[in-house]
Regions:
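Conserved functional micro-motifs across diverse proteins
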Residues: 20-192
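Sec-dependent N-terminal signal peptides
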Residues: 3-15
Length: 192
């Protein structure tokens, strides 16, 4: 019994000593723990909790520079109150939600000081592809998967239907490699 108690205390202390998700401030969160580095900017969600869709900006990169990781759009999920939510299709979002351009314009005006203080400053994030590109003359190409290798990461907008988020709620954004489900990354987001 005493051994079990000591083991439990060690687990609790180790978990407290090595937090997985860092709160970077200004609605930004990052996690360097898993094989996929993941940073999430949730500033737009926190500014507009009543929107029918939640916009998160995801920054992903591989921890091992020699590994090529491909994340399929179906392998990006939001877990809220124990329920897993998938992203809508691009067609569904464009049909049901006219606020995409407003979201992106609003996001451009948010401060990036929080997210840039994380590991993302060490990687390059090409803007040629996106899961949810805004329609326009010089828009990125819509893709169903994003790849990362070496010092090149993948940045994309991710939308989820709003399940009724409120201030103080916690949710988790999870991603995994298309070919190897053991290669994952996740970030816990606290809605403030």
């Amino acid at each position: 019994m005493k051994t079990l108690r000591v083991a439990l205390m060690l687990v609790i202390l180790c978990a407290a000593a090595y937090p997985q998700t860092q709160d970077l401030g200004l609605g930004a969160f990052a996690n360097e723990k898993g094989p996929i580095l993941l940073a999430v900017d949730a500033g737009q969600v926190m500014a507009d909790l009543k929107s029918p869709y939640c916009l998160f900006i995801l920054y992903m990169a591989t921890k091992q520079g020699n590994r090529n990781v491909v994340v399929d759009r179906n392998d990006v999920t939001m877990v809220y109150k124990g329920q897993e939510y998938k992203m809508p299709s691009l067609e569904e979002l464009r049909k049901d939600y006219p606020g995409e351009i407003r979201d992106v314009d609003f996001y451009r005006h948010l401060a990036k000081a929080g997210i840039i203080s994380s590991w993302i400053r060490l990687y390059e994030f090409p803007t040629r592809t996106d899961f949810f590109p805004v329609l326009g003359a010089n828009s990125p190409l819509p893709v169903d998967q994003g790849s990362m290798t070496g010092a090149i990461g993948f940045r994309t907008k991710c939308y989820f239907k709003n399940p009724g988020l409120e201030r103080g709620d916690k949710l988790t954004i999870k991603v995994r490699d298309k070919k190897n489900p053991d290669i994952t990354g996740e970030v816990e987001v606290t809605i403030k």
